[in-house]
């Protein structure tokens, strides 16, 4: 009899636990993580491919013809800096290159452990996919020039909620 009661209690507890969990219904992209360890809520391989396809073919940024440049590689330190900034913008509901604590992109990149010679940052809000955010950045002259800069050798990016951050850099 006691065994039945314990079994019934376990069964009811299991059902109650599962029914109290809220399923995440937000639209998140898959997270292939080619280099490793930073969970960025973006499809890193897709972002890297879209950026490098553009860099390798060249493009027009505003009225400036940008010739083909070498591809960039993924960097987890840059991705970590991007994640910090996207999280900050999302949690404090603002949109700016300046962090809520007054930090610049260079400050955040340095804090993530990346020793840079040059860096650039792109931010966006509201784009539903990796392709949409890259397309948006490429239609903005300044963002496009960041992506196409021959001085940029590595990148990392992250999305939190509807806030995207891309960090580009070279050491």
Where are these regions (language model features)?
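Sec-dependent bacterial lipoprotein signal peptides
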Residues: 1-18
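Hydrophobic alpha-helical segments, especially transmembrane helices
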Residues: 4-6, 56, 144
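Bacterial Sec-dependent N-terminal signal peptides
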Residues: 13-42
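Disulfide-bonded cysteines in secreted/extracellular proteins and peptides
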Residues: 20, 59-61, 144
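A short alpha-helix/helix-coil micro-patch that ends at or immediately precedes a cysteine
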Residues: 32-91
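Short, surface-exposed glycine/acidic/tryptophan-bearing loops
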Residues: 76-129, 147
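Disulfide-stabilized extracellular recognition modules
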Residues: 116, 120-171
């Amino acid at each position: 009899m006691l065994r039945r009661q314990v079994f019934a209690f376990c069964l009811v507890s299991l059902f109650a636990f599962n029914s109290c969990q809220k399923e995440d219904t937000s639209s998140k992209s898959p997270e292939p993580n080619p280099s490793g360890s930073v969970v960025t809520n973006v499809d890193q391989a897709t972002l890297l491919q879209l950026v490098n396809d553009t860099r390798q073919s060249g493009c027009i940024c505003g009225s400036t013809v940008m010739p083909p440049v070498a591809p960039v590689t993924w960097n987890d330190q840059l991705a970590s800096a991007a994640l910090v900034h996207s999280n900050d913008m999302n949690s404090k509901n603002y949109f700016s290159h300046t962090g809520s604590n007054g930090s610049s992109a260079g400050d955040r990149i340095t804090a993530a452990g990346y020793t840079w010679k040059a860096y650039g940052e792109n931010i966006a809000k509201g784009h539903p996919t990796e392709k949409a955010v890259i397309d948006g950045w490429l239609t903005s002259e300044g963002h496009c020039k960041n992506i196409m800069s021959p001085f940029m050798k590595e990148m990392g990016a992250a999305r939190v909620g509807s806030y995207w951050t891309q960090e580009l850099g070279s050491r």
